[in-house]
Amino acid sequence: MRFIQEFGYTVKIGQDEAHQKWVIANDAALRAASPAGSKYLGIYAVVFSSEKQAGFYKVLMELDSYGAMDKAAAAAKDPKGAWAKLIRESTQFTDLDLSAPWSNTLLRNVIDATIWDPKT
């Protein structure tokens, strides 16, 4: 199975440049620390979108199974793990106001998806 998980978020006002510098400095570390079954694809700035409340930045992760989400959750809880450290550090830029745009999407590759037409 192949999945892409997308986390959309908004950066606090006045923190976009610091956020970009942090991403540049930590991109390779995020890639290296990806939990088992997951591959960090990067953090992307939204150039244009029809979604108005989905966040202006997207973290994209490739997952090899549904179970990879459990492994990622466990890695995020490990106080000594590099993944947990980086994720916690990155939240300094996240606008946590409940009205701030955000999103969370799980995409499954069509090749692996169960798809059928309804009987008419």
Question: What are the functions of these language-model segments?
Answer:
Residues M1, W116-P118:
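Intrinsic disorder/low-complexity detector
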Residues R2-T10, K58:
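Active-site-flanking beta-strand signature of metal-NTP-handling nucleotidyl enzymes
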Residues I4, F48-S50:
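Short, solvent-exposed aromatic-acidic interface loops
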Residues T10-K21:
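Short, surface-exposed ligand-recognition loops at beta-strand->loop->(often short) alpha-helix junctions
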Residues E17-H19, M69-K71, T114:
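Short acidic, gly/pro-rich beta-turn/loop elements at beta-sheet edges
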Residues A25-L41, S50-F56, L60-V110, K119-T120:
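An amphipathic, aromatic/His-enriched active-site/gating alpha helix that lines ligand/cofactor pockets
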